[in-house]
Amino acid sequence: MNNLKNLRGTVDLFPDQLIKWQNVEKILLEQLSRASIKEIRTPILEMTELFIRGIGEGTDVVSKEMYTFLDRGERSCTLRPEGTASVARALIQNGISSNPIQKLWYMGPMFRYERPQAGRQRQFHQLGVEFIGHDSVRSDVEIIALAWDILRKLGIKELNLEINTLGDTNDRSNFQKSFLKWLETNKDSLDLDSQNRISKNPLRILDSKNIQTKKVLENAPRLFNFLSEKSHNRYLDLKRQLEVLKIPYVENFNLVRGLDYYTHTAFEITSGALGSQATVCGGGRYDDLIKQMGGPNTPAIGFAIGLERLILLAGKELEIPRNTDIYIINKGLVAESLAMDLSRKLRNYDLLVELDLSGASFSKQFKKANKLKSKSIIVIGEDEAVNGEFIIRLFDQSGNGNEEEVISFENDIKLENWINNNLLVK
């Protein structure tokens, strides 16, 4: 029993650490709500076939990184490695045709078998946003702007937006024929991993991080040169609208993302403050995915943000806990019962109330209130309990008491006035 540990790549998060998580999540939810984006929740566990069909069998995610197993019914199941395929499945299964235009978000744990490092775990948390049924360039721009504004709202520094276009299916097919010929000619100059991708997922070679391969790729055909006039004009319109919004961008023609379902717009937002794991947000358009999975022809675009990396980058001010508003010091059988009832009443005022359950001496309870930097204290002893009243007072920064007030347990008006004048005052 003493040797039981969490699995490598998973992390226990304790209250002090979760202060920042909760503050970040609160800001995220506020921003999403203001943009009229609604929440969707899908299972963590899905049929493996969903990700093979949705993400692509030749991708690293499916071939190397998924947590897959047979359940007791001999069905192949997988812990979700990303959220878009699950959202698409949920919409198809529940009748997307009845509501084909939606803006959705989800947040929760995902699972990939990768080498753990700072900001990357095997169980990680992701915020995803999906605009379903939207095919205009304006929807691309809105979703990029939303991601950009969220990251800036969180105080993340040194942000850089990289964009590319992957064209449509015909554009990529024409490019891939030329690219495969070039790859066969230059195969020996590529790193081993890229050589193995030629037959499985050649487009991913463009995104190689190998220095030698990146240098060789400088002379490779560019997908951009195979775009139809329609795809090319779409990309020009994307850039124009980003410039109107004064969102700076850099074109990266090797940006293809790691999943097979992307079409047209692909983008990443990086932070120079993160070092090697610079990508904070990634996304793009996936107009063919829902149809490919058996649904109606439905355009869509989305992005995902890794929360672990977000937590590393978010401002220090988000680590500051909210101080206790009222600490209830109580001792004695009747006093403890009255204190419990009072704590429930006080929480209805949206106050952070802590009830001391220790039964320790008054002096020790005072020290605990001081340690928590409580804004105020309530004292209920045996005498107060007999008289049906309690003592309430503010604490100053040194922990010393201010002028106290005695309030009857039945005098809700006096209690409410004290709270409004001392704790809820702007």
UniProtKB/Swiss-Prot annotation:
One of its GO terms (cellular component) is cytoplasm. It is found in: Cytoplasm. Its EC number is 6.1.1.21. One of its GO terms (biological process) is histidyl-tRNA aminoacylation. Its main location: cytoplasm. Homodimer. Belongs to the class-II aminoacyl-tRNA synthetase family. This is Histidine--tRNA ligase. It comes from Prochlorococcus marinus (strain AS9601). The gene is hisS.
